[in-house]
A protein has these predicted regions:
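A feature for loop-to-transmembrane-helix boundaries and adjacent hydrophobic helices
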Residues: 1-310
Length: 310
């Protein structure tokens, strides 16, 4: 059932007041959608924030800009491919063949964040190798912008009336009207995830990043924090992507929950290894190595005073 342009209300918070926000911002050509505008705004704000943080990680603003300018389009492509692969039945014609023309209509919604993250991190890895900079320092800087982009981008789902949760009677439930007399009360999961990302950003910026002891620590925190939140929120949603037709204990396996669990376990293992085995203390951070190299080059470039005549 499509809820595009359906009236919205929050009866537990605002009573009978309802409002309608069109999914299209401008009717130019096939239309300019709020979904795309909001996602683009999130990306740009995330990029700006990362640029201003770059020096703290031994990076230049150009490093961040060049990485993100490549990562953004490739991440969108990755997010769409991921969504299409796991929701392939939605893109089939009545005879079972794939309707290829519908696979690229991203303005109608249908981007899977994990596909975008995978593509973005692969781009960052290739870029870091080419520029000879630390991949983990680069991702430590960029995950801050990723939190920002996701927190803002989830409001694109709100504009499309998608990615909501199961029926609920909680006070903050969101009501989607299908007619003047029929409606659905659901979990506003887009809001849950947006707030979860905002909290993650605050914890990362004010606590984790200021006590960073190894390159990759911010990245591990991002995957653990986002993974825990996504595992919980995904269980509330009704439009989950499933791992083909595989089941566990009689239940179909949700792709995002499976990936979230793997991410949390792997990154928790990395933290234990770094702190307990390698005894990471921050002395080998990329930013410190860059500072030491710069100081050595400046010292070598200083003119040597001529010997005094005897």
């Amino acid at each position: 059932m499509s809820f595009s342009n359906a009236p919205i209300s929050f009866p537990g918070l605002f009573g009978d007041w309802q409002f309608t926000v069109p999914s299209k911002a401008l009717n130019i050509g096939s239309g300019i959608y709020w979904y795309g505008i909001i996602i683009a705004a999130g990306m740009l704000l995330g990029l700006y924030f990362c640029m201003k943080q770059a020096h703290k990680y031994g990076l230049s603003e150009d490093n961040v800009i060049d990485t993100v300018l490549w990562a953004i389009p490739l991440s969108v492509i990755g997010a769409r491919i991921y969504y299409v692969l796991f929701y392939l039945d939605l893109f089939r014609n009545s005879d079972g063949s794939i309707n290829w023309s519908s696979t690229y209509r991203i303005w109608d919604g249908g981007l899977a964040i994990y596909g975008g993250v995978i593509a973005g991190f692969l781009t960052a890895y290739l870029f870091s190798r080419r520029r000879k900079i630390s991949f983990w320092a680069l991702t430590d800087c960029c995950v801050q912008g990723l939190f920002i982009g996701q927190a803002i981008g989830r409001w694109g789902n709100f504009m499309n009336r998608e990615a909501f949760g199961a029926a609920t009677e909680l006070p903050w439930r969101m009501r989607l009207w299908t007619s003047t007399t029929t409606y659905m009360d659901v979990h506003p999961t887009f809001l849950y995830e947006s707030l979860w990302n905002v909290i993650g950003l605050l914890l990362l910026y004010f606590i984790v990043s200021r006590a960073r002891r190894f390159d990759g620590e911010n990245t591990c925190f991002y995957f653990i924090w986002y993974g825990l939140g996504r595992f919980w929120i995904e269980g509330l949603r009704t439009d989950s992507l499933y791992l083909f037709h595989w089941t566990l204990f009689g239940q179909r396996i949700r792709v995002s929950q499976a990936l979230s669990l793997v991410m949390v376990l792997v990154c928790a293992g990395i933290l234990v290894y770094q702190f307990k085995v390698k005894k990471a203390d921050g002395s080998n951070l990329f930013v410190k190595r860059v500072q030491q190299t710069t100081e050595a080059e400046e010292a070598a470039a200083e003119p040597t005073a001529p010997d005094e005549k005897q």
